[in-house]
Amino acid sequence: MQELYFRELGEGKPLIILHGLLGTSDNWLTLGKKYAEHFKVYILDQRNHGQSFHDDEFSYPAMAEDLLNFMNNQNIEKAHILGHSMGGKVAMTFATEHPNRVDKLIVADIGPQSYPPHHTLIFKGLFSLDLPNLSSRKEADEKLAEYIPEFGVRQFLLKNL
């Protein structure tokens, strides 16, 4: 069993934060510090993101299982769970499978429905990168710009390189 990277802040009832697709725990650090005034906050890097392990299996049930393993490893019986976007889908899956482990569920920026693919160009851009042969982030940015015109989106993606 592989373990997730996480940041731990504050004291009190546990609040677990799950980031969105292509995000990391960094995205939630500012709010996590604020929430830590009232809760013991765990900000996770989900599988295939940030400093957590990478695996071919990438599904909501697998990620919900990662969350269960994390809670068991940290001796967290029950927690408030906040999930953003993809993290919201993971949180909803987890709450459905393990309702007795969820104190409060907060789902942000996504609903319990299927969505059509809308990251196609982003993934094409990412897959076009020849990572071993890139010499700089600027070079990666120039390649991504062929697929992704928004500077801010590219900078967000480059954080994971």
State where each predicted segment sits.
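Conserved alpha/beta-hydrolase catalytic His-Asp/Glu region
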Residues: 132-161
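Active-site glycine-rich loops that stabilize anionic/oxyanionic intermediates
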Residues: 11-12, 20-23, 85
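Alpha/beta-hydrolase active-site loop signature
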Residues: 22, 46-50, 112
